[in-house]
Protein backbone atom coordinates (compact mmCIF):
# COMPACT_ATOMS: atom_id res chain seq x y z
CA UNK A 1 0.00 0.00 0.00
CA UNK A 2 2.80 2.39 0.89
CA UNK A 3 4.53 1.67 -2.40
CA UNK A 4 1.35 2.53 -4.36
CA UNK A 5 0.96 5.83 -2.52
CA UNK A 6 4.57 6.70 -3.27
CA UNK A 7 4.11 5.94 -6.99
CA UNK A 8 0.85 7.93 -7.10
CA UNK A 9 2.51 10.88 -5.35
CA UNK A 10 5.50 10.73 -7.74
CA UNK A 11 3.18 10.62 -10.77
CA UNK A 12 1.20 13.64 -9.57
CA UNK A 13 4.41 15.62 -8.96
CA UNK A 14 5.68 14.71 -12.43
CA UNK A 15 2.44 15.87 -14.12
CA UNK A 16 2.46 19.17 -12.21
CA UNK A 17 6.11 19.71 -13.11
CA UNK A 18 5.39 19.09 -16.82
CA UNK A 19 2.63 21.71 -16.81
CA UNK A 20 5.07 24.19 -15.30
CA UNK A 21 7.97 23.40 -17.67
CA UNK A 22 6.15 22.84 -20.98
CA UNK A 23 5.15 26.49 -21.58
CA UNK A 24 8.76 27.57 -21.06
CA UNK A 25 9.98 25.07 -23.67
CA UNK A 26 7.66 26.31 -26.43
CA UNK A 27 9.55 27.63 -29.45
CA UNK A 28 9.12 31.35 -30.16
CA UNK A 29 7.24 32.34 -33.29
CA UNK A 30 9.88 34.91 -34.18
CA UNK A 31 13.52 35.54 -33.36
CA UNK A 32 14.26 38.35 -30.94
CA UNK A 33 16.83 41.07 -31.44
CA UNK A 34 20.22 40.06 -30.11
CA UNK A 35 20.68 43.54 -28.65
CA UNK A 36 18.80 46.86 -28.62
CA UNK A 37 19.77 48.71 -31.77
CA UNK A 38 18.76 51.65 -33.88
CA UNK A 39 17.38 50.70 -37.28
CA UNK A 40 19.96 49.92 -39.95
CA UNK A 41 17.63 51.45 -42.54
CA UNK A 42 14.15 53.02 -42.48
CA UNK A 43 11.74 53.53 -45.37
CA UNK A 44 8.02 53.87 -46.10
CA UNK A 45 6.00 51.56 -48.32
CA UNK A 46 2.71 49.73 -48.67
CA UNK A 47 2.00 46.52 -46.79
CA UNK A 48 -0.50 43.82 -47.59
CA UNK A 49 -1.15 40.57 -45.76
CA UNK A 50 -1.64 36.90 -46.45
CA UNK A 51 -3.26 34.49 -44.12
CA UNK A 52 -5.01 31.23 -43.35
CA UNK A 53 -5.41 30.22 -47.01
CA UNK A 54 -1.63 29.81 -47.19
CA UNK A 55 -1.27 27.79 -43.96
CA UNK A 56 0.79 24.64 -44.45
CA UNK A 57 2.40 25.76 -47.71
CA UNK A 58 6.15 26.10 -48.00
CA UNK A 59 7.62 29.58 -47.94
CA UNK A 60 10.51 30.58 -50.19
CA UNK A 61 13.05 29.66 -47.49
CA UNK A 62 11.52 26.19 -47.04
CA UNK A 63 9.62 26.81 -43.80
CA UNK A 64 5.95 25.91 -43.51
CA UNK A 65 3.79 29.05 -43.49
CA UNK A 66 1.89 29.74 -40.27
CA UNK A 67 -0.56 32.67 -40.41
CA UNK A 68 -0.14 33.12 -36.63
CA UNK A 69 3.66 33.50 -36.78
CA UNK A 70 5.38 36.88 -36.71
CA UNK A 71 6.74 36.58 -40.24
CA UNK A 72 6.65 38.44 -43.54
CA UNK A 73 7.59 38.27 -47.20
CA UNK A 74 9.91 40.80 -48.82
CA UNK A 75 11.25 40.88 -52.39
CA UNK A 76 14.97 41.03 -51.57
CA UNK A 77 15.84 41.29 -47.85
CA UNK A 78 17.84 38.24 -46.71
CA UNK A 79 15.88 35.47 -45.02
CA UNK A 80 16.09 35.88 -41.26
CA UNK A 81 16.20 39.68 -41.37
CA UNK A 82 14.27 41.32 -38.55
CA UNK A 83 12.05 44.23 -39.58
CA UNK A 84 9.88 46.44 -37.40
CA UNK A 85 6.67 47.20 -39.30
CA UNK A 86 4.88 50.35 -38.09
CA UNK A 87 1.37 51.37 -39.16
CA UNK A 88 1.91 55.05 -40.00
CA UNK A 89 -1.72 55.89 -39.25
CA UNK A 90 -1.99 54.31 -35.78
CA UNK A 91 1.62 53.96 -34.62
CA UNK A 92 1.09 50.26 -33.83
CA UNK A 93 4.13 48.13 -34.63
CA UNK A 94 5.37 44.55 -34.69
CA UNK A 95 8.76 42.90 -35.18
CA UNK A 96 8.73 40.33 -37.99
CA UNK A 97 11.22 37.86 -39.42
CA UNK A 98 11.55 37.64 -43.22
CA UNK A 99 10.98 34.04 -44.35
CA UNK A 100 9.31 34.40 -47.76
CA UNK A 101 9.47 36.31 -51.04
CA UNK A 102 6.85 38.72 -52.28
CA UNK A 103 4.69 40.68 -52.61
CA UNK A 104 4.41 40.42 -56.34
CA UNK A 105 1.97 43.30 -56.83
CA UNK A 106 3.40 46.62 -58.00
CA UNK A 107 3.50 49.27 -55.30
CA UNK A 108 3.67 46.85 -52.38
CA UNK A 109 6.79 46.56 -50.26
CA UNK A 110 5.97 43.78 -47.77
CA UNK A 111 3.41 41.02 -47.13
CA UNK A 112 2.84 40.32 -43.43
CA UNK A 113 1.19 37.32 -41.81
CA UNK A 114 -2.44 37.47 -40.70
CA UNK A 115 -1.40 37.78 -37.04
CA UNK A 116 0.78 40.81 -37.78
CA UNK A 117 -1.92 42.41 -39.95
CA UNK A 118 -4.46 41.92 -37.17
CA UNK A 119 -2.17 43.54 -34.57
CA UNK A 120 -1.36 46.48 -36.86
CA UNK A 121 -4.99 47.01 -37.89
CA UNK A 122 -4.44 46.19 -41.58
CA UNK A 123 -7.10 43.49 -42.04
CA UNK A 124 -9.99 45.63 -43.28
CA UNK A 125 -7.88 48.01 -45.36
CA UNK A 126 -6.07 45.16 -47.11
CA UNK A 127 -3.22 47.46 -48.12
CA UNK A 128 -1.88 50.23 -45.88
CA UNK A 129 1.11 52.52 -45.69
CA UNK A 130 3.73 51.38 -43.19
CA UNK A 131 7.17 52.42 -42.05
CA UNK A 132 9.71 49.63 -42.31
CA UNK A 133 12.71 49.63 -40.00
CA UNK A 134 15.42 47.08 -40.77
CA UNK A 135 16.58 46.15 -37.27
CA UNK A 136 18.91 43.19 -37.82
CA UNK A 137 20.39 41.19 -40.66
CA UNK A 138 20.94 37.45 -40.18
CA UNK A 139 24.31 36.26 -38.90
CA UNK A 140 26.59 34.96 -41.65
CA UNK A 141 27.62 31.36 -41.05
Language-model region placement:
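Secreted/periplasmic proteins
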Residues: 2-141
Amino acid sequence: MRHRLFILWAAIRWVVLMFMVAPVMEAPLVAHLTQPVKPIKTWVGNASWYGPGFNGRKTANGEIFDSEALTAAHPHLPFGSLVRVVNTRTGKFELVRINDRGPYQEGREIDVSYRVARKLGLIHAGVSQVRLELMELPQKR
